[in-house]
Amino acid sequence: MASAAGAITRLARVAGPAAVPAILYGAYKQNAVAAIEAFFTGPGRTSRIVALVVVLWNWKSLPLAWTYRVINGMISHLLVRNLHTYTPDKLFQPIKTETHVTLLEVDYNIHKSNSTYFADLDVSRTHLVGHLLARGLRAISSNASTKLVMDPSDPSRPARGAFGVVLGGVQCSFKKELKPYQRYEMWSRILSWDRKWLYIVTHYVDKGAVKSGAKPEDWEKKIHASAVSKYVFKIGRLTVHPAVLIEASGLLPERPGGWVKVENGLGEEPNGAAANGHAAPESAVWDWKRTEKERLKGLEYAEHLASLDGLLDQFEPGEDGPLGVFGPG
């Protein structure tokens, strides 16, 4: 994701200043104003206007619309917006994206098709990672100069290769249907991470159901679906520990031994258990113990998604091959 955004950023810086006058000149030569006027006032204008409204209201399902939505998320957070200055207590906080069910997303049950939830997830995750981890993404995409990740085979030089963010899996649980043209929100946040994967949880919620950061009354009835996704970060063939990126984004408090080196256990109880076995009062300061406590809590759910990688062993071609070959598929 970041490597693509970097290429787009460089292209925009070069082509952007030249593109605007070129577009304006082209519109002038083609008499665009007269064409627009004829569209809205000429014979057959009613059908054209109705068709335009339908297209605009369903634009997210048009060809290349998904590509635009994802790339727009990359550019807006990595190029246009100022980098955030969040502190570690914001690491597990959500971002929200808003959209609606289009006509082309509706299936024969007259509700949003289950398959279309995943396209929305791509967009929401892009906004979350692009916004929350923008500082780390910028640093690691220029790893040759920032030296954020060193080459394991030669620790004296930085790891080299194209940086990329790869989706490793998604699991979605559907709770309640979304009806045609119904508006809804996607609330995405970091759930947890391990040595390889960054886990993200997303909830599909009724638009306007959440007020002032508090759960609404009967909030379970406001959630239409919940999904967990996992990302892996790569520099060439090298897997980058998610904590490297999170720490470079200023979202991890200092931890004895460091976040990457400490792989098993905490050295002490994450809830600050006292010597008598009773939990000590939680510190008002967001320290590494609170971050680790939240990470481990989310990991209990994330590990279920990770365990699905073992399903590869369950592939069975059948004793005599498939029972049938059917299409169209």
Residue ranges and their predicted role:
Residues 102-143:
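Conserved, ordered domain cores of eukaryotic regulatory proteins
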Residues 5-82, 178-180, 189-329:
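HotDog/MaoC-like acyl-thioester-processing domains
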